[in-house]
Amino acid sequence: MQIFVKTLTGKTITLEVEGSDNIENVKAKIQDKEGIPPDQQRLIFAGKQLEDGRTLSDYNIQKESTLHLVLRLRGGMQIFVKTLTGKTITLEVEGSDNIENVKAKIQDKEGIPPDQQRLIFAGKQLEDGRTLSDYNIQKESTLHLVLRLRGGMQIFVKTLTGKTITLEVEGSDNIENVKAKIQDKEGIPPDQQRLIFAGKQLEDGRTLSDYNIQKESTLHLVLRLRGGL
């Protein structure tokens, strides 16, 4: 059968294969056509990296399927950066790159100034002067990119179902405003919302600053039942 292999440059290679071919065989065929050594090839299908010992059939790769070929850099590595819109950016980096370098690469690709970027990995915000290796960020790690709003900040609201909502707020916003934003996102009327921070229930007339709620703070949302106290 024929399958297609698409490279990052946009070139598409056609290969003749059998379902029983293993991924190593496929990489050898790509080497024959393109001269790329198998140890520098990574093949992706349906978002999964394909392992050498498995066959095309194992991954349900059928005729006319398209695989994506990503090059494994010698000494370098690829990492992924996921934005809040769900878009994933691929970056070529070295473990010795510092976070500032990474933000510069994101600016090159996406046009977002570094001072508006916040990068999160394993729940931690990454500091400019530190390196990827300092944070144990390895090949194929995924960082999360959050935009820093001028003058505003982001906070998180966690519901009892475990869902986390992100809100854009100002420290001067009062709790009523925050509940209105939650209503806009989730459709929950403010009179059914109870917001908790640091174990305290937040009162409508007070502001986020009154409770020392800062950027990236997490509030907990509890629903007030109709007819309840």
Curated annotation (Swiss-Prot):
Keywords: Cytoplasm, Isopeptide bond, Nucleus, Repeat, Ubl conjugation. Pfam families: ubiquitin. Disulfide bonds: none annotated. Its main location: cytoplasm. GO terms for biological process: modification-dependent protein catabolic process; protein ubiquitination. One of its GO terms (molecular function) is protein tag activity. The keyword Cytoplasm applies. Gene3D superfamilies: Phosphatidylinositol 3-kinase Catalytic Subunit, Chain A, domain 1. Residues 1-76, 77-152, 153-228 form the Ubiquitin-like domain. There is a cross-link at residue 48 (Glycyl lysine isopeptide (Lys-Gly) (interchain with G-Cter in ubiquitin)). There is a cross-link at residue 76 (Glycyl lysine isopeptide (Gly-Lys) (interchain with K-? in acceptor proteins)). Residues 229 form a propeptide. InterPro entries: Ubiquitin-like_dom, Ubiquitin-like_domsf, Ubiquitin_CS, Ubiquitin_dom, Ubiquitin_ubiquitin-like. SMART domains: UBQ. It is found in: Cytoplasm; Nucleus. GO terms for cellular component: cytoplasm; nucleus. Ubiquitin is synthesized as a polyubiquitin precursor with exact head to tail repeats. Some ubiquitin genes contain a single copy of ubiquitin fused to a ribosomal protein. In D.discoideum there are 9 genes: ubqA: 5 copies of Ub and a final Asn; ubqB: 1 copy of Ub and ribosomal protein eL40; ubqC: 1 copy of Ub and ribosomal protein eS31; ubqD: 3 copies of Ub and a final Leu; ubqF: 7 copies of Ub and a final Asn; ubqG: 5 copies of Ub and a final Leu; ubqH: 5 copies of Ub and a final Asn; ubqI: 4 copies of Ub and a final Asn; ubqJ: 4 copies of Ub and a final Asn. Belongs to the ubiquitin family. Ubiquitin exists either covalently attached to another protein, or free (unanchored). When covalently bound, it is conjugated to target proteins via an isopeptide bond either as a monomer (monoubiquitin), a polymer linked via different Lys residues of the ubiquitin (polyubiquitin chains) or a linear polymer linked via the initiator Met of the ubiquitin (linear polyubiquitin chains). Polyubiquitin chains, when attached to a target protein, have different functions depending on the Lys residue of the ubiquitin that is linked: Lys-48-linked is involved in protein degradation via the proteasome. This is Polyubiquitin-D. It comes from Dictyostelium discoideum.
